[in-house]
């Protein structure tokens, strides 16, 4: 009797399982990885016109280095805020460190994220800052060791009502020796988004394309997609001023575009660019010796300017944390075009 009952129950269960009206939901034990796969299949922009429609017009100032006198203005920009969040590859400039200590002692809450194992590292700045600020209240230093990136190479400083995005580290060379570009803005949407990204990186949470404001280009999230599309979408001109070019995909795109449009590039006069092939003819490439070219700037069709921390290398695009911003302000673009022309005049033909 019991056997018949059990067989009957089993038959009922099987019938229920096979019923087309029954649906089952299986919980994903690794939803973060699934979200990442879905996110990677999305695109930021469908074409150049879509990009121009989606990005916001952002006002601000672009400051060109070297300019040793600007250090005072930079310090002043940090002075009137209750919170400072810094994400950088390097922080060694003594005046900035002293100023941060003074601000923290006066009550400003300061959080610093910095690379822990720099390429060709001569000193561990993370440990050095921990030591210097050990007795200073209101300063918290955190490395990138918990992040799923190779290098924390982004360079942003966030205050209560404004932010800096820059090509430069917070070093003496930035202000005294290097060609760098620093962008400051009070745009509240970008500031809010950068703060959210900072919090996610600080806590080790994964970033997705859906986390990003349309004007932000973040490695290793959407930067390869955005930069390859922009270079490919260019119709009239591309102007690049950056430290070097080593990424094969970007190289191929630029080589192809060089036959179709006005391509002008300025690189640092170092061994890393000596292997650029000779088919970049017609004076398309110039090499700058002084000041040392450390900036990372790209202008597409005189309409879209990219400024930030990313070098044109596979490591930067695919492995590092890098942050760029898309700028479409005609006045800021005109300023860059003017300085680019001046740098090109004093650079050597390849």
PLM regions: where:
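N-terminal Sec-pathway targeting helices
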Residues: 1-13
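Hydrophobic alpha-helical membrane-insertion segments, chiefly the h-region
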Residues: 13-23
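HKD-type phospholipase D/PLD-like phosphodiesterase module
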Residues: 21-82, 90-232, 248, 252, ...
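Long, repeat-rich segments with strong aromatic
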Residues: 228, 239-246
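Amphipathic alpha-helical interface segments
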Residues: 327, 331-350
């Amino acid at each position: 009797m019991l056997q018949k009952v059990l067989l009957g129950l089993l038959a009922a269960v099987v019938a229920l399982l096979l019923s087309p009206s029954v649906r089952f939901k299986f919980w994903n034990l690794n939803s973060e990885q699934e979200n990442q796969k879905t996110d990677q299949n999305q695109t930021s922009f469908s074409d150049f016109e879509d990009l121009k429609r989606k990005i916001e017009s952002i006002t601000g100032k672009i400051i060109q280095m070297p300019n040793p006198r600007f250090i005072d203005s930079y310090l002043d920009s940090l002075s009137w805020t209750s919170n400072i969040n810094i994400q950088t590859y390097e922080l060694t400039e003594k005046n900035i460190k002293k100023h941060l200590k003074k601000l923290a002692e006066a009550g400003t809450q300061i959080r610093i994220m910095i690379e822990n194992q720099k390429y060709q590292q001569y000193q561990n700045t993370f440990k050095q800052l921990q030591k210097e600020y050990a007795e200073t209240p209101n300063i918290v230093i955190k490395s990138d060791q918990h992040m799923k990136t190779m290098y924390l190479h982004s360079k942003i400083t966030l205050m209560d009502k404004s932010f800096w995005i820059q090509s430069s580290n917070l070093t003496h060379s930035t202000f005294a020796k290097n060609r760098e570009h620093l962008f400051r803005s009070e745009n509240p949407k970008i500031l809010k988004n950068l703060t959210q990204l900072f919090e996610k990186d600080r806590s080790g949470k994964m970033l997705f394309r859906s986390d990003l404001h349309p004007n932000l280009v973040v490695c290793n999230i959407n930067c390869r997609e955005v930069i390859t599309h922009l270079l490919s979408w260019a119709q009239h001109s591309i102007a690049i001023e950056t430290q070097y070019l080593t990424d094969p995909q970007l190289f191929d795109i630029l080589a192809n575009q060089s036959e179709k449009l006005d391509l002008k590039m300025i690189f640092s006069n170092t061994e890393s660019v000596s292997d650029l092939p000779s088919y970049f003819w017609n004076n398309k490439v110039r090499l700058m010796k002084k000041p040392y070219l450390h900036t990372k700037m790209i202008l597409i069709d005189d309409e879209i300017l990219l400024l930030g921390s990313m070098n044109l290398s596979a490591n930067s695009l695919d492995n590092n944390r890098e942050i760029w911003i898309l700028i479409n302000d005609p006045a800021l673009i005109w300023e860059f075009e003017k300085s680019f022309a001046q740098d090109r005049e004093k650079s050597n033909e390849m």
